[in-house]
Amino acid sequence: MPHETLLDNQGWFKKLARRFGPGHVVNTCFLIVMLFSTLLTWREVMILKDAYVASQRNHLGSVANVLDRQLQFNMDRLIFLRNGMHEALVAPLAFSALQSAVTQFEQRRVRHFWQLELDKRRTLPLYGVSDQFVARTTLLSRESRDLANELTATLELGYLARLARSSAMLALETMYVSRSGFYLSTLPTAYGSDIVSRYYQYVTQPWFIEQSQRRNSQRGVRWFTSAQPYVTDEQKKVTASLPLDHDNYWYGVLAMDIPVASLQRFLRDAAEKDIEGEYQLYDNHLRLLTDSAPEQQTANTLNDRERALLAREIEKDTLGGLRLGTHYVSWERLDHFDGILLRVHTLREGIQGNFGSISIALTLLWGLFTAMLLISWGVIRHMVKNMFVLQNSLQWQAWHDPLTRLYNRGALFEKASRLAKRYREARQPFSVIQLDLDYFKSVNDRFGHQAGDRVLSHAAGLIGSTIRAHDIAGRVGGEEFCIVLPGATKAQALQIAERIRQRINDKEILVTKSTTLRISASMGISSAEEYGDYDFEQLQSLADKRLYYAKQSGRNRICASDATQEREKK
């Protein structure tokens, strides 16, 4: 087994080359190529994703604009009615019919229910309840000094409300409910106790109660959703309400009821050309009002977790998008409705669409390129590995003796010279052993060269297993070996040589099927500490000279000094 001492002062490039062989270089190159191809593909995916998000927002924005314009049309009518009534409060008309209506009110105000009507063809009737009913709660009051003006303004509102009705409006009912115990509505009420129940229903609704000056300090339009559990889908509605104030006094509320069914029809019409995605309208509490899904199809509703995630995102911006499982949800707040419009796009719709086709093609291209890259990497890696193995084999053959598997003469001298130089600079001991097998020629002559080869291989194995890990050994001649002992003093070298001599002498070798042979070795030792000379060739020559003395003294001996001072060891 060959021993090799690694030099600490090798160049950084050689160390790097030793650490990173051709296989590592191939792996690194292919890894860089795959990384860049993946990054480029990922960049394309991000661009495609941004385009997809922009497409979703554009689809949602077009439908939201149509719905918002329609709601704005209705809100403009409501504000127009409020402004007209406010003008009537400030400057009431001095028509005799209006004055007569005030007189009739004074006569009927104590009744349980009553009705005032000026002209059935041009105005809407006014319905009211008694003073006793109004006095039951602090929310209602007939103590206003402008009660007569409010009454005439409400009658004038009847003209405007009748004229303002249009088939293009989403609203089913427009009404004014006064805190003074009367109301006006575009939907007629049968004369009787229904007037009381209807007025009671109005003044107990959130859209009326929440318009007090304390609860609505901005005095703007507010939206409310009917959330009663017993209300059917056909009866669901949203209500827009607007307070009527003058001189810091709250007179009442103008309101407009819009059926959810009307919103659904309008939403389906607006999204008719958009064959992908589903539109959903939610109120400000994220309660689903309606959707654009066909009647035979179930809507993609949000669960509680998805609703919470969406609510958190809505707090940050007025529009955006969010991936929820296999759905992509884009949302936008409406300008004229206190709620949001959602567009839900499923994974199946995305795959079947244009962006899905592009994504699939991009994925297939990346997969094909990656597969080709991996196959090429495997082929080149295999070729480089074979070349590297061949190179190492040739290099090993160039440095080692094929029979003994120790260093050959050239490699040994090169490595030993570098070691000697290093230990000379460090001023550390350095020793050399020269070894020769005794009577080796007779082994070849008696048993043949194959037996001789077996003896050489056997001796080399014993040498390699006896020396230290950082020592090196090589075959420098026919049956002659050289052992380099860096860091070993002459005494230590003598101990190592003695162990080698004993092991070689103690082991028998099977040279033929029925014949064993015991061999011996003679050795000469030299050390740099003797003369301070670290020149390896000089040390090897001196050890070889002492080897000759050992042989002259009878073989199977070690000579560690000149012939006049040598000590024999058997």
Curated annotation (Swiss-Prot):
Cellular compartment(s)? Cell inner membrane
Q: How is the cofactor bound?
A: Binds 1 Mg(2+) ion per monomer.
**Transmembrane residue ranges:** 20-40, 360-380
Q: Does the keyword Metal-binding apply?
A: yes
- SMART domains in alphabetical order: GGDEF
Keywords carried by this UniProt record:
Cell inner membrane, Cell membrane, Cellulose biosynthesis, GTP-binding, Magnesium, Membrane, Metal-binding, Nucleotide-binding, Transferase, Transmembrane, Transmembrane helix
What is a single cellular component term in the Gene Ontology annotation? plasma membrane
EC assignment: the record states 2.7.7.65
Chief subcellular site?
membrane
Q: List the catalysed reactions.
A: 2 GTP = 3',3'-c-di-GMP + 2 diphosphate
Q: In which pathway does it act?
A: Glycan metabolism; bacterial cellulose biosynthesis; Purine metabolism; 3',5'-cyclic di-GMP biosynthesis
Identify its membrane topology class.
Multi-pass membrane protein
Top EC class per UniProt? transferase
Q: Which residues bind substrate?
A: 444, 449, 453
| Cofactor(s) this protein cannot do without | Mg(2+)
Q: Where is this site: Transition state stabilizer?
A: 441
Q: Which residues form the GGDEF domain?
A: 428-563
Source domain of life is: Bacteria
Q: How does it assemble?
A: Homodimer.
Entry protein name: Probable diguanylate cyclase DgcQ
Q: Which organism is it from?
A: Salmonella typhimurium (strain LT2 / SGSC1412 / ATCC 700720)
Q: Which gene encodes it?
A: dgcQ
